[in-house]
Amino acid sequence: MLAMNQSLNELKDQVLKCTNCSLAYTRRQVIFGEGNPRASIMVVGEAPGYDEDIQGRPFVGKSGQLLDKILAACGFSRTEHLYISNIVKCHPPENRVPTLNEAEICMPYLLKQIEIIDPKILILLGASSLKYMAGNTYRITRDRGKWIPVNGRLAMPVFHPAALLRNPALKRPTWDDYKEVVRKYRELLMSIISRITYSN
């Protein structure tokens, strides 16, 4: 645990000093991510928004409040079950979508986070997260709710909470997607427990 935290903190120190793209000169602060560094589930968003840039934490605005409600309904908490991060670690001006260049520059940091935390499940929030994590052939409207492989891990694309705020009709199918995440999480947990039981 100590080595993992040390490795994650070393990466955080590196990210906090990053000036590799123009967002370094417009951000207030870097939003590295937060949660359990040993989490089985990692939530990957697009980029920090205005509220996140002010508070220095991921998903604290209206979208984040809705995300927390959904996760709590699943029985998940940020501190125990999850680690939350973004494709891009700095707030794009005017809350715009990150450019391809910005995402490509920042992606190695996210991939290193995933390598260190080693989650079993990735929840990909929205079209940008799906595109940058899984590739251009995927579409959020077509592929949400389906398990897809991402870097040897199970990934579940879901609508971004901001989309649910704009279109409440998306809430029901999104809840179905999260229920599938809960089902898979429990399945993986039981598999681990069974292996431990049989080995004793």
Sequence positions of predicted segments:
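A polyanion-binding, active-site-adjacent surface
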Residues: 1-200
